[in-house]
Structures are given as C-alpha cells and as structure tokens.
Amino acid sequence: MKMKLFGRWDYEDVTVEDPGLRDYINLKPMLIPYSGGRHQKHRFGKAKIPIIERLAGRLMTSGHLGKKHKWTSEHQTGKKYNAYKIIIRTFEIIEKRTKQNPLKVFVKAIENAAPREETTTIEYGGARYPKAVDCSPQRRVDLAIRHMVWGAFHGSRKKPISIEEALAEEIINAYNNSLKSYAIKRKLEIEKTAESAR
C-alpha cells in the first residue's frame, strides 16, 4: 500500500529539481507529517522535518512580520490541528485550480521563492557596511515558506478572502513565478539589495 499525504496526495511524482535544496526539503512519505520535535536538539535537524510540518509550524506564527508583531498570532499558536486543516483545504483549492498534485506545486513554489543571496552587516573601524553573502540552503527554504505564509496571512487579514484561499493563491503565484506572489517579490528585493551591496 502506498503512503499518501493525508491519505490523498501521492509523494511518488514529487521531486526537488534544485540540487542545492534537495537535502533540505524532506519528502519522506508520511500519512500525517508529525515528528513530535524529535530533531530540535540536533544541529541542522530541521532538514529532517517533513516540509508540510514546517509549513504547519510557520502557519502557527503567521502574524510575526520580521521582528514586528504587526498582528498577533495567538489565535493560531500551538494549534497544529488547525494548521493541518488549513493545509488540507489549501491543497484542495490548488488541486482544483491547477489540476496537478498540490504537493508538487508547493515544492516547486518553494524552489522558485527561495532567495539565492542576501546581505549581512560588516563593521570596519566603527562604520557598518552591507555585504552580499550566499544564502544557505536551509535558510533559503525557511525564507521561502515564511514569505509565502506572510503573504497569505496579510492578504487575508481584514478582507473577505479566507486564509486557505489566500495561501493557495500565494503558492500558485509562486509556482508560476508571478510577481503577484509576495514571496517572489521579496526574493527579488533581497537579491537586488545583495547585488547592489557587492
């Protein structure tokens, strides 16, 4: 018997094309992706957490826009079951709109939205300068998921659109490399800033 995500979506035809991200997007077949925090004490243990569980974890802190808590996330925090329900409904919408495996669409969206370089601050003699640096694969995946969730959450906030519809729209736009996607816009911004700081 084949293991399917939530008993519905197949893992078999899903592959990661970007060789840099291949080891950091865990697509190990699981019915319900839940690791119970087994990897949290290990360095780079995050890479072993299923990618859907990482999305669920990010959905629970959706209001944190950078260091600003523009809106609170208290209505989501700790409610993993609610996060999984959002993911299931989002994947249903993606499947209906694209006629493709939503897991495949989501993985491709992460690949498209992951920034390749960013800036860091270096201090020389009391003055600070921005310096372009390569983004590690783990951070690339983290930023892609974070930006997709932020885009969806802030796109549905105080609007008649639900979080599931907003997240589906965000993932589909990132999959299509569309500038309507907040994640793609942020990626281009980050890379442009890094290019000017070389």
From Swiss-Prot:
Q: Does the keyword Ribonucleoprotein apply?
A: yes
What HAMAP family does the entry give?
Ribosomal_uS7_A
Q: Can you list the GO cellular component terms from the UniProt entry?
A: small ribosomal subunit
Role this protein plays: One of the primary rRNA binding proteins, it binds directly to 16S rRNA where it nucleates assembly of the head domain of the 30S subunit. Is located at the subunit interface close to the decoding center.
**Lineage, broadest ranks:** Archaea, Nanobdellota, Candidatus Nanoarchaeia, Nanoarchaeales, Nanoarchaeaceae
Q: Looking at the keywords, is Ribonucleoprotein present?
A: yes
Q: Which InterPro entries match?
A: Ribosomal_uS7, Ribosomal_uS7_arc, Ribosomal_uS7_dom, Ribosomal_uS7_dom_sf, Ribosomal_uS7_euk/arc
Biological process GO annotation list? translation
Protein name as catalogued = Small ribosomal subunit protein uS7
Q: What's one Pfam family the UniProt record gives for this protein?
A: Ribosomal_S7
Q: Which GO terms describe its molecular function?
A: rRNA binding; structural constituent of ribosome
Q: Which organism is it from?
A: Nanoarchaeum equitans (strain Kin4-M)
SUPFAM superfamilies xref list: Ribosomal protein S7
Keywords per UniProt: Ribonucleoprotein, Ribosomal protein, RNA-binding, rRNA-binding
Entry-linked Gene3D superfamilies: Ribosomal protein S7 domain (1.10.455.10)
Q: How does it assemble?
A: Part of the 30S ribosomal subunit.
The record's comment on protein family reads: Belongs to the universal ribosomal protein uS7 family.
